[in-house]
Design a protein with these regions (language model features):
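C-terminal structural segments of small proteins and small subunits
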Residues: 71-91, 95
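Short S/T/G/P-rich N-terminal loop/turn motif that feeds into the first structured element of a domain
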Residues: 1-59, 65-71, 75, 98-100
C-alpha cells in the first residue's frame, strides 16, 4: 500500500492464442500505454506448472499504483485500440484485483 492507496493488479490467463504475431503486436503497442498509467510488469509468460484448475497457455500480471489507475488504463481508448490487434485471435480471462 502506498500512502494509504490500494494497488491494483491485472491478472490475465491466456487460454488460447491462435496467432502469436498478433499477440506480439498487441504487447508492443500496449506496453507503453500500460506503463504511462504506472503499470509495472511482474509476470510475462515464463515457466509454470498447473496444479489445479483449467489449462492456460500464458500468464501475465501487471501492478499499478492504485486499483483506480488499473481500471482507468483498461478503459482507455489507447489500450482498447491496442487490444483490437489480438482480441479476435486470443482468448483470455482478465481480472483487475485490489492488492497491497
Amino acid at each position: 500500500m502506498v500512502g494509504g492507496l490500494v494497488k491494483g493488479y491485472w491478472i490475465a490467463l491466456y487460454k488460447k492464442i491462435r496467432d502469436m504475431d498478433n499477440l506480439k503486436n498487441y504487447a508492443a503497442k500496449v506496453t507503453p500505454v500500460i506503463k504511462s498509467y504506472g503499470g509495472k510488469p511482474l509476470v510475462r509468460g515464463g515457466k509454470f506448472i498447473k496444479l489445479e484448475g483449467d489449462d492456460f497457455k500464458r500468464l501475465v500480471v501487471w501492478e499499478f499504483p492504485t486499483y483506480e489507475k488499473a481500471v482507468e488504463c483498461h478503459n482507455s481508448k489507447e489500450y482498447k485500440d491496442g487490444w483490437s490487434l489480438a482480441k479476435d485471435t486470443t482468448e483470455r480471462n482478465l481480472q483487475i484485483v485490489e492488492g497491497t
